[in-house]
Design a protein with these regions (language model features):
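Topology signature of small-to-medium multi-pass alpha-helical membrane proteins
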Residues: 2-211
Length: 211
């Protein structure tokens, strides 16, 4: 008859970290934390690109229905759709830690700025060279011409103010966006130069850029 095992003969259960060292060593965990800190500004740029892409896409969708009646709306709507597509393309490159991502996003904002400036200039040109918006009323009631004269001038003034604001604000906002994207290149370079490749691959998937 065999003897019952004594407590000393029974080994205490070992934790998974003691048996296989765990999925990551302390050094690996430390490297991952440091990589997360280095990549924060790159990830923030990806979120900015997502916001810009969705915003441009929504405005494109709202503009394109008017393309049936206006060539200007067709050009602007198509331009906005292209900006949205390119913004998402640049975001994908950025989340794949492609060094060309910041450049694509920066130039996309410059293209967006050019589109808005062109739209503003065309609006001002059309206001000054197009037909009088009150011509039909004046033709039907000639006595209103004296009263509508100042209103016509106000129409031109409002056109300059509105389209001028479009031009100025696009230069400010799209210009700053472009500068922001271009300056992300140095942060991306620092991340890639100082981060082990296995962490880069891991963070591609965790950020939604893998696949």
């Amino acid at each position: 008859m065999s003897a019952l095992p004594t407590p000393a003969m029974i080994d205490a259960p070992r934790s998974s970290s003691e048996t296989d060292g765990g999925p990551l060593t302390p050094e690996h965990q430390r490297a991952l934390v440091e990589a997360n800190q280095r990549g924060q500004k790159v990830m923030a740029a990806g979120k900015m690109a997502a916001f810009n892409g969705w915003t441009s896409g929504i405005f494109a969708a709202l503009t394109l229905p008017f393309a049936l009646f206006s060539l200007t709306a067709l050009v602007v709507g198509a331009g906005l759709a292209l900006v949205a597509w390119n913004e998402f393309r640049g975001r994908k490159l950025l989340l794949h830690f492609d060094r060309g991502g910041p450049r694509v996003l920066g130039w996309n904002q410059i293209g967006f700025m050019a589109l808005l400036i062109g739209y503003g200039l065309w609006g001002i040109y059309a206001a000054f060279t197009g037909p009088n918006p009150y011509a039909d009323q004046i033709k039907a009631m000639p006595e209103l011409e004296q009263m509508l004269g100042p209103i016509d001038e106000l129409h031109l003034l409002l056109a300059v103010a509105v389209y001028g604001c479009v031009i100025v604000f696009s230069m400010i906002f799209q210009g700053l966006n472009a500068l922001y994207y271009f300056t992300r290149r140095k942060h991306l370079d620092a991340y890639l130069d100082q981060t082990p490749s296995w962490i880069v691959d891991l963070q591609k998937f965790s950020a939604g850029g893998g696949g």
